[in-house]
């Protein structure tokens, strides 16, 4: 396995709760895809699931950023270009589109390993970019 990048992020659930209380869940329309919003809204504790998705997106961005000091906007990667999905066995997965997918291809990414965890206090995500052996 050839590791091309790693990213980690932590989001406090209380911050997401406060944003929802202040501005409503619609504030996340610019950050989450329709499928992500639908999933989060279907859960008993939407803020926790929003928080873990935001952490996952940021972890993937950090991994894609690599040694570059560029920000998301400088790389041209939008929040909705990194989507957290679930594979058939229920494990979290990542789908990249647009600039995010182009960046991954340019780095030689063949697979993104994602680990998510959350409590009622915090959500954490770790993303590992994997290239082909020998890259």
Predicted regions and their residues:
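Core catalytic alpha/beta fold that binds nucleotide/phospho-ligands
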Residues: 1-135
């Amino acid at each position: 396995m050839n590791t091309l990048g790693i990213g980690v992020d932590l989001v406090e659930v209380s911050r997401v709760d406060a944003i929802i209380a202040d501005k409503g869940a619609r504030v996340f329309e610019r950050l989450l895809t329709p499928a992500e919003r639908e999933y989060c809204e279907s859960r008993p504790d939407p803020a926790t699931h929003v928080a873990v998705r935001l952490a996952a997106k940021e972890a993937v961005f950090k991994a894609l950023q690599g040694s570059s000091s560029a920000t998301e906007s400088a790389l041209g990667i939008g929040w909705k270009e990194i989507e957290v999905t679930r594979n058939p066995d229920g494990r979290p997965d990542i789908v990249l589109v647009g600039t995010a997918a182009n960046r991954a291809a340019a780095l030689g990414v063949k697979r993104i390993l994602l680990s998510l965890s959350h409590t009622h206090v915090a959500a954490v995500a770790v993303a590992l970019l994997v290239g082909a052996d020998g890259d």
